[in-house]
Amino acid sequence: MANSAPENVHPQKAFGWAARDTSGTLSPLKFSRRATGEQDVTFKVLYCGICHSDLHYIKNEWGNAVYPAIPGHEIVGVVTEVGNKVQNFKVGDKVGVGCMVGSCRSCESCENHLENYCPKMILTYGSTYYDGTLTYGGYSDIMVVEEHFAVRIPDNMALDATAPLLCAGVTVYSPLKHFELDKPGLHIGVVGLGGLGHMAVKFGKAFGAKVTVISTSPNKKDEAVNRLGADSFVVSREPEQMQSAMGTLDGIIDTVSAAHPLLPLLGLLKSQGKMIMVGVPDKPLELPVFPLLQGRKILAGSCIGGMKETQEMIDFAAKHDIKSDIEVVPMDYVNTAMERLLKGDVRYRFVIDVANTLKAE
């Protein structure tokens, strides 16, 4: 089966855009999806967000790419078929799929609704599925997914602006909840104002926190405070501004994926403050231990969220009208979008209009 052409592996014909090599250039690909199983939902993909992880993966920057690679793990659509044992979805329902499509369902993490930390977690693309075949993501016309790994999208949510919540949204929501930074009146710092950072500001404000954005870019102050609603803004390269913010934060969500010093940020925390890393720098960061000891501070990491938590996040976002700030693009613009993403030239997430612009050839 490994030698079969992608379009012949499974019975359902599918079409998407794939990278063939480390250039990361995406182009049309005919492939196939499995038949709808007893516990599967099949859905037509309407929108798919473009995540920075997609860019890393298609260029094999993490060394784990398998080609052809169809990326995309911020996927929303409408159900077209359900298996005979599916209980939670019906044809016509709006659904979303995030970063994973499988897990062992029996380990301690899975039993605690933390499928995202299962050692056998199956990623939405670039992973080996239970049947030994390669998983393909949402830059495609249809998806087939086990119902456990789909979330329901409430009717009042705009599907295009909801897609990025399935990765960026839950990536910041999960640590805010787990580390109890979701309590009204706390003071939260958000490092970096990009796809993840702007979502952290929105969720933080919805939780009732005071939010300070910390950025290297002074020109983002107006955006952070006046448009996104942050309470204050600190330029991390300005020693006086950093000094005035020392010891003021209950928690920090660090969304930056570039190498950067941790020491100045740890200094912003109050005693027993918590700093959670959600960005993925490509080089190791230097960890100064003494500041952790001095204030009994916590430095932790967090990666996406479990399925129960992802549904909770979507429902919370629906209730508080939280959505991603997006630029909708056609499928044939995706390579240009990747180039712009590499330069940080997007506010704040590209979303592909799959349903209206993916043309089978």
UniProtKB/Swiss-Prot annotation:
EC number(s) per entry: 1.1.1.255
Protein name as it appears in the record: Probable mannitol dehydrogenase
Enzyme's top EC category: oxidoreductase
Role, per record: Oxidizes mannitol to mannose. Provides the initial step by which translocated mannitol is committed to central metabolism and, by regulating mannitol pool size, is important in regulating salt tolerance at the cellular level.
Binding site residues for Zn(2+) 1: 51, 73, 167
Claim: Metal-binding is one of the keywords in the record: yes
InterPro entries the record matches: ADH-like_C, ADH-like_N, ADH_Zn_CS, CAD-like, GroES-like_sf, NAD(P)-bd_dom_sf, PKS_ER
Catalytic activity: D-mannitol + NAD(+) = D-mannose + NADH + H(+)
SMART domains: PKS_ER
Family recorded in the similarity comment: Belongs to the zinc-containing alcohol dehydrogenase family.
Cofactor: Zn(2+)
GO terms of molecular function: mannitol dehydrogenase activity; zinc ion binding
Gene from which this protein is expressed: ELI3
Species this chain originates from: Mesembryanthemum crystallinum (Common ice plant)
PANTHER family, A to Z: ALDEHYDE REDUCTASE
Cofactor binding, note field: Binds 2 Zn(2+) ions per subunit.
Residues bound to Zn(2+) 2: 104, 107, 110, 118
Swiss-Prot/TrEMBL keywords: Metal-binding, NAD, Oxidoreductase, Zinc
